[in-house]
């Protein structure tokens, strides 16, 4: 019997939670990962290697999907100290991906090589073969370029789009990305930052078109917390409305919403300063937009913060897959 094909789309902070749990299931996994990051280590590497697709999100996804021993993982994720000169703040894995990207001719090729080396469960694809610049247009008409600058701009985001950083052309999807979406049984969007992790992938025209054409079940994992500079005062219905608006029509089949209350002591603004308050529920608004709304306890409290429980999310996704068979 053919294994179900599940493709997860997003960034390197949110989707590893899902990918780690999917590895335990009898499914074929693919991850499509944003390449619009221009902050931190990825941003510094982009300044010095203009052809480089930012490696940070890809690094985290690689670790989540690999069978590397814990020591290898620590080495790959090791971040140089602030007194390390030119290497300060860079994770070793980012430097390895950057070096292999140059050696192999592209980040796509580098990720395929690293996936074999670390025995990943599934395929990892950058959403584009070129570094992208994320642009946010705010409701007052002002525009900000660069993912790392968007959250600091006051006001509400109206929409976002991406350009090829190298020449401002309309970006193309990376190899096999469109085919992977069209051949999937399920597409999972998120969890992760709405405007800076999920949308930078799906506003690539070829990817957006594939999402509208695929016969796969499309599930969106709604965020638990609102995010500073992105989704302040958003309900869960608002998140879905933004996704649909960016592709021009409704395309999500299922939304998964956490209804477990986050204890006040886990709303740690000192440690997680980008997260504000728990997302409010608007089930009437969701039901107008989505055929299936699954609300349950998907909460995991860990390290002083509130996160999605990957096992609970994936168990629900597997139930949906079984119903579709």
Language-model segment annotations:
Residues 1-6, 20-23, 28-31, 119, ...:
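Non-transmembrane, aqueous-exposed alpha-helical and coiled segments at domain scale
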Residues 1-55:
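Gly/lys/ser-thr-rich phosphate-binding loops in alpha/beta enzymes
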Residues 14-19, 196-203:
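Short glycine/serine/threonine-rich phosphate/pyrophosphate-binding segments
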Residues 27, 214-218, 290-291:
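A short helix->loop->beta-strand "cap" motif at the edges of active sites that frequently abuts
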Residues 36-156, 316, 323:
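Electropositive, gly/pro-rich neighborhoods at or near active sites that engage anionic ligands
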Residues 130-195:
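Active-site gating loop/helix substructures
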Residues 201-208, 234-239:
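Charged helix-capping and loop-helix junction motifs
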